[in-house]
């Protein structure tokens, strides 16, 4: 619903190291935040016990994937279980990003949500 309070803010300083901007991460963050604006939820929430309602998005279960037992699901722990999705709750670590890991995928149902979002019309 359009009004004067809708929008997305993204910190450039959170996506920079010195004078270098992490453009891939910035693009993924922008896509993620716009996904929220258009009606998408995190595929897996931080604790690995709450998931979106879409039946074709992967779930990363805390009970089987929280290898470091810190109660938070990292992209590394959830590789192959939704971490590659634009709407995963946490980005890859810098080391994984350097190895080519990205969050660029959307499921068919997520694409449908975006297609039919009233804001996107």
Describe the role of every protein-language-model region.
Residues 10, 87-88, 114:
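Bulky hydrophobic/aromatic "packing anchor" residues in well-ordered structure
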Residues 1-22:
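Active-site scaffold of zinc-dependent metalloenzymes
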Residues 20-106:
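The catalytic-center signature of Zn2+-dependent metalloproteases
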Residues 98-121:
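A recurrent domain-boundary module in secreted/ectodomain proteins
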Residues 7, 28-31, 111:
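Extracytoplasmic/secreted envelope proteins and their assembly/folding machinery
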